[in-house]
A protein has these predicted regions:
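Active-site pocket-lining/capping segments in soluble small-molecule metabolic enzymes
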Residues: 1-143, 147, 153-296
Length: 296
């Protein structure tokens, strides 16, 4: 049976959630779909110079985080997708220490944008694998193909607007299909032309550099992320899409975004993508829901 591998958000940011969820996932397999598993969990601690995509907010200890991943056989990934790195940034002690820990663990990866960082990590930490970040905004199919041809990347995350270019995607050779990692639940406006500028603003912020704050001009931007809105996005990939379309076509890797969101919403992602509908209430009860919980 072909298995869908999910790549989940919040390695550091949602450590406490995963401390509750992963034992449940292991001890009650009957609650969860048997056609999918957890391929990796990605994220970055707060104040990481090499960080990108989102400003990291995780405060959990790296040793605790990596011990949890090791206990459950899950690949940890560092989100180091800053697109504005310069040579002097490669000496950053904290980011190097994190990479060293992953390198020693043997199954860790780094999500990145910068070729400068890629070359440095290849030379310095040979046990790491690399993921080409969606922050590259690969909206052109020839650009995606060129990225898939790069041997240094184990996975490539295309822009979500290529998710349903099914005829072109299906024509890829299987070796390239194995590398595609679809971003499933993006809520960003499908017609956005500022996505690259948005990511660059985050990169500047992580470097501590001055710059104009990016202002999102998308319709309904003030409403923030809503999963219900993401489900209406033309680029959305849902459970039925994965089972009926992507797995039969030979695609197995699916990324769930959400590092900057609250843990309650991330739990909803875990329920939707991993959990059988009839068991979702049981998972909520195990994680947080009891008969004395008040909302108001």
């Amino acid at each position: 049976m072909t298995i869908a591998h999910y790549h989940l958000p919040g390695l550091f940011e949602f450590y406490e959630l995963y401390c509750r969820f992963l034992p449940l996932y292991r001890n009650h397999p009957e609650y969860f779909y048997d056609w999918c598993d957890i391929g990796s969990i990605y994220g970055a601690p707060a104040d990481c110079l090499w960080g990108g995509g989102r400003v990291g907010s995780g405060e959990a200890s790296a040793r605790d985080v990596l011990a949890l991943m090791r206990d459950y056989g899950i690949s940890p990934r560092l989100t180091f997708s800053n697109s504005l790195l310069r040579a002097e940034h490669l000496r950053d002690a904290r980011c190097n220490a994190l990479c060293r820990m992953l390198n020693d663990g043997g199954n860790g990866g780094v999500i990145l944008h910068s070729d400068l960082l890629l070359r440095y990590l290849q030379k310095t930490y040979p046990n790491l694998y690399f993921v080409s970040s969606t922050t590259k905004v690969l909206t052109s199919f020839p650009d995606l193909q060129a990225e898939l041809e790069r041997a240094e990347f184990r996975y490539v995350v295309p822009d979500f607007r290529l998710n349903h270019a099914l005829e072109k995607l299906n024509a890829l050779p299987q070796g390239q299909k194995d590398k595609v990692e679809f971003l499933c639940n993006e809520c960003c406006y499908f017609g956005c032309r500022d996505r690259r500028a948005c990511y660059e603003a985050v990169s500047r912020k992580n470097l501590g550099e001055d710059g104009d704050e990016h202002r999102c001009h998308a319709p309904d931007a003030a409403g923030g992320y809503r999963f219900s809105k993401a489900m209406e996005n033309p680029g959305f990939i849902g459970v039925a899409d994965i089972q009926r379309t992507y797995l039969p076509m030979g695609f197995e890797n699916f990324k769930i975004e959400g590092r900057e969101l609250g843990s309650a919403l991330v739990l909803e992602f875990l329920l939707y993508y991993l959990t059988k509908p009839e068991c979702q209430l049981k998972v909520r009860e195990e994680i947080y829901l009891d008969n004395m919980l008040d909302l108001f």
